[in-house]
Amino acid sequence: REGRVAEYTVAMIGPPDLPPREDVTLGERDVLQGMKVANVNPSVLSEYQLPILPEGVVVLETGLIAPRVGVQRGDILREIDGRKITVPADVVQALSTARRSVSLVVERGGQLVLLRFRL
């Protein structure tokens, strides 16, 4: 003010981890056993360098099977067999009703990728 320079010290904090991540790890009987998914929030966006608020859930860990069908850590899982994925529990539900083949729509690097595999 009035031509004077002022210096301030501001404490920086990390991005909020809200809404909660609600991590879900798929179990032994699930199609993509060991894959871990979570809600996307500002903390996850920063940690995985994701685009601004994508729709879907983020793959935190792939487990052993998911990489074999093309799923990568940091992918945003948007659809399973045409069902929109909005929360981690949707992944468990959609995969539990999977038939002989499964299709996944993931967002990777700003592009949508279709992954298909047989059970």
Residue ranges and their predicted role:
Residues 1-119:
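C-terminal recognition in membrane/secretory proteostasis and scaffolding
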